[in-house]
Amino acid sequence: MHKAPESVLNALVPMVVEQTAKGERSYDIYSRLLKERVIFLVGQVEEHMANLIVAQLLFLESESPDKDIYLYINSPGGSVTAGMAIYDTMQFIKPNVSTVCIGQAASMGAFLLAGGAKGKRHCLPNSRVMIHQPLGGFQGQASDIAIHAQEILGIKNKLNQMLAEHTGQPLEVIERDTDRDNFMSATQAMDYGLVDSLLTSRS
């Protein structure tokens, strides 16, 4: 599939101009929203994206350790290790991280959505959430394949335990429901405990 050059994608990012005492200052829209403590997690969860998200979380903690951070998620999922780097940082930093699903939060995206601060995890009404077990593919000698299979099983068990803690569901329910792709509406995700509320309009 043809991929647009990065310069073209950058040109599509809107710029915001602010008036200050020293004159005009322009920001790309994401930098401007970062000033409001808003972070976007959009697209595939991979190492480069995870590093950027972690850096933004740490920066906002250093700016105001007692103010909430808002993480907007629209992601099909991706790398478990990259996702866990984001998740561990969310739990480690002092500010509460409020998560909001816009569009979709699937696989690792759903895990990060559920990992937000309790009472501060939200879905927009037409968003979709999907949970499942981690995917793995490996080629090589039989002994190496066995090692990787054990690693995937260990990750699966760990993620299921953490998801049970965040949702309040029994572990056996999580194990059953993540055995295959399990799609949920925003309301179903709230009933399941992945999020705490639906956001339909600004209060």
UniProtKB/Swiss-Prot annotation:
Record's keyword terms, sorted: Cytoplasm, Hydrolase, Protease, Serine protease
Catalytic-site annotation from UniProt: S107 (nucleophile), H132
Gene Ontology MF terms in the entry: ATP-dependent peptidase activity; ATPase binding; serine-type endopeptidase activity
Chemical reaction(s) catalysed: Hydrolysis of proteins to small peptides in the presence of ATP and magnesium. alpha-casein is the usual test substrate. In the absence of ATP, only oligopeptides shorter than five residues are hydrolyzed (such as succinyl-Leu-Tyr-|-NHMec, and Leu-Tyr-Leu-|-Tyr-Trp, in which cleavage of the -Tyr-|-Leu- and -Tyr-|-Trp bonds also occurs)
Alphabetical GO biological process terms: protein quality control for misfolded or incompletely synthesized proteins
Predominant location: cytoplasm
Compartment(s): Cytoplasm
InterPro entries: ClpP, ClpP/crotonase-like_dom_sf, ClpP/TepA, ClpP_His_AS, ClpP_Ser_AS
Enzyme Commission identifier(s): 3.4.21.92
Catalytic class of the enzyme: hydrolase
Family of this protein: Belongs to the peptidase S14 family.
Function of the molecule: Cleaves peptides in various proteins in a process that requires ATP hydrolysis. Has a chymotrypsin-like activity. Plays a major role in the degradation of misfolded proteins.
Record protein name field: ATP-dependent Clp protease proteolytic subunit
Organism the protein comes from: Shewanella denitrificans (strain OS217 / ATCC BAA-1090 / DSM 15013)
Taxon lineage: Bacteria, Pseudomonadati, Pseudomonadota, Gammaproteobacteria, Alteromonadales
Gene of this entry: clpP
